[in-house]
C-alpha cells in the first residue's frame, strides 16, 4: 500500500494484461461491461491516483457478481504478482 494524501491506496496496474485478466476472472464491478468500461470508469474518477485504487472504494463499490464483497487485493507491480489481502 502507499499513502496518498493521508489515505492508503492499493496498487493496481490496469495496463498490465495479467491484472486485467484477474479483474475479468473476479467479475468485479457492478454493471460490468468489459475491461474497457472498467478502465474508463476508474481513470475518470477520483479513486484512480497514480495507478493506485482506494481500498475503501473497492470495499464499498466493487463486488463479485454473486454479491460477495471483493475485499482488498494487493498487487505487486514489479513482479506482476497478485495477492489476496486476506491471506
Q: What residues fall within each predicted segment?
A:
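Structural boundary micro-motifs
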Residues: 1-87
Amino acid at each position: 500500500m502507499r499513502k496518498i494524501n493521508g489515505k492508503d491506496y492499493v496498487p493496481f496496474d490496469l495496463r498490465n494484461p495479467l491484472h486485467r485478466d484477474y479483474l475479468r476472472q473476479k467479475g468485479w464491478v457492478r454493471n460490468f461491461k468489459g475491461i474497457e468500461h472498467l478502465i474508463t470508469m476508474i481513470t475518470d474518477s477520483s479513486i484512480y491516483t497514480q495507478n493506485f485504487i482506494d481500498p475503501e472504494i473497492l470495499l464499498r463499490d466493487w463486488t463479485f457478481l454473486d454479491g460477495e464483497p471483493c475485499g482488498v487485493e494487493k498487487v505487486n507491480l514489479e513482479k506482476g504478482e497478485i495477492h489476496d489481502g486476506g491471506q
